[in-house]
Amino acid sequence: MKKVSVIVPVYNAAEFLAETLDTILNQTLEDIEVIAVNDGSADNSWEILEDYAARDTRMHIIDQKNGGPSAARNNGLNHAEGEYVFFFDSDDLLVEDALEIMYEKAKRMDADLVIGKYDIFNGVSLTSVKNLDELVSQDVIDKYDKGIL
């Protein structure tokens, strides 16, 4: 069993997709599987996914009709075999030890859910979200989930 299944819904993401996949596949935690679900892209996203799958056995690719990101995530989840699941968007980037840090923290704390610091870049400015209080105040997670890490 892989430690982490990384699920990436992909829709017309060719511009950023290679960089996104590189940040996942170059993680210090190597015991992962990447499940990329092409959600009916009209650009060359599928060809990029095929290229990565041919080069790295940790890549699993699925092609589906467009159903939106939730349908793509659910499809990926149906194929996931990892101990933990990490949802990742096709235009996101990770620091190289992000999955290892979150996995080790989850194991050590016997956590069901781990939320890490992240930055949001809207093309103009960068906003850092650093702690649970900020997430709760933004209604990103249910305010009753106080026991999460």
Sequence positions of predicted segments:
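Nucleotide-sugar donor-binding/catalytic module of glycosyltransferases
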Residues: 1-149
